[in-house]
Amino acid sequence: MLYYLLKYINDVFDPPGFGVIEFLTFRASAAAITALLISLMAGPWFIRYLKGRFIEPVKEEAPPEHKKKKELPTMGGILIIFSIEVSVFLWAKFDDPHVWLVMLAIFWMGLIGFIDDYRKVVLKIKGGLSARYKLLGQISLGLVIGLYTWFDPAFAVLLSKTTIPFIKQLSIDYGIFYIPIVIFIITAVSNSVNLTDGLDGLASGTTAIVVSALGAFSYLAGNAVYADYLKIPFIPGGGEIAVVCMAIVMACVGFLWFNSNPAEIIMGDTGSLALGSAVAVIALLIKQELLLPVLAGVFVLEALSVSMQVLYFKLTKKLSGQGRRIFLMAPLHHHFQLKGWAEQKIVIRFWIISILFFLTSLMTLKLR
């Protein structure tokens, strides 16, 4: 909205300084500041409103340290989503389909997460929304994203093609498998972020790091000169995603102000599913989805720990009659909790690992 207003003023009256609205870096920075301020200013009121209304009880199977915590208001993801949506609405270009697809993903999976949280904390239905309905929501989003990008001429340049990290000379054409792969990536990443949201600040901080890198890739991919120099796919209009990325990053940072240990609020599935789907869709749109195992390495490790734990337990139970575990508890962050690591230490160390993955991902820009 502000973009079009300021652009109109600049075109009609040509006041000094208003031309800066055309610069992507300015609008990305403005979106970041707006998202941060909304989070910080609305946060205290929002927390007061949620207290006594939407409290998530501590799970019975939670580690002992978790059981010592007071029950916290959940659905904090609403604050994150609101901050993102408003800042993007103010500073991004509405006519860019990349922006709307990411916004659709955030709203869609945020709604699925909200229903799940509402069933758990208000209706007191154990487990919230059943896994099959969550999966249905993820598959539906994947279908919409996949079909839209398949048929919209704006995405016809690359469509089902993508690049291989570290080997830029090679590319892959998914062909008829494009839509199933889109569905798989959206489902896998959104679930991975959801599994990571188990300690104060872990999911929000890690997401901010991951999306920062995606923002850099988006900016470079949307510039024909930079894309050609770095040998990455040129995505016409893809630079506009950087505005969305910066809004996501600072909405997470603003939320982290209240979510850091000891947390005053948690994001719930409302936030984790929305953020996970955003990460997946952004990576797909800028053709960096194959980089996610590196860039989103912490999310991948968390998801793998759960898969390995379940499979190993079932296999050993079938072979010996008694199930065994690889980890003390899954996801991985709970394993370290039970080993005696302080929660703050786990979170900070996982952030450090995320930064290492972030830097490794940026290194791929110069590798031929």
UniProtKB/Swiss-Prot annotation:
Belongs to the glycosyltransferase 4 family. MraY subfamily. Pathway: Cell wall biogenesis; peptidoglycan biosynthesis. It catalyses: UDP-N-acetyl-alpha-D-muramoyl-L-alanyl-gamma-D-glutamyl-meso-2,6-diaminopimeloyl-D-alanyl-D-alanine + di-trans,octa-cis-undecaprenyl phosphate = di-trans,octa-cis-undecaprenyl diphospho-N-acetyl-alpha-D-muramoyl-L-alanyl-D-glutamyl-meso-2,6-diaminopimeloyl-D-alanyl-D-alanine + UMP. GO terms for molecular function: metal ion binding; phospho-N-acetylmuramoyl-pentapeptide-transferase activity; UDP-N-acetylmuramoyl-L-alanyl-D-glutamyl-meso-2,6-diaminopimelyl-D-alanyl-D-alanine:undecaprenyl-phosphate transferase activity. Its cofactor is Mg(2+). GO terms for biological process: cell division; cell wall organization; peptidoglycan biosynthetic process; regulation of cell shape. The gene is mraY. Coiled coil: none annotated. Catalyzes the initial step of the lipid cycle reactions in the biosynthesis of the cell wall peptidoglycan: transfers peptidoglycan precursor phospho-MurNAc-pentapeptide from UDP-MurNAc-pentapeptide onto the lipid carrier undecaprenyl phosphate, yielding undecaprenyl-pyrophosphoryl-MurNAc-pentapeptide, known as lipid I. The chain crosses the membrane at residues 30-50, 72-92, 98-118, 139-159, 170-190, 201-221, 238-258, 264-286, 345-365. Signal peptide: none annotated. GO terms for cellular component: plasma membrane. Disulfide bonds: none annotated. It is an enzyme of class 2 (transferase). The keyword Cell membrane applies. Keywords: Cell cycle, Cell division, Cell inner membrane, Cell membrane, Cell shape, Cell wall biogenesis/degradation, Magnesium, Membrane, Metal-binding, Peptidoglycan synthesis, Transferase, Transmembrane, Transmembrane helix. InterPro entries: Glycosyl_transferase_4 (IPR000715), PNAcMuramoyl-5peptid_Trfase (IPR003524), PNAcMuramoyl-5peptid_Trfase_CS (IPR018480). This is Phospho-N-acetylmuramoyl-pentapeptide-transferase. It is found in: Cell inner membrane. Its EC number is 2.7.8.13. It is a multi-pass membrane protein.
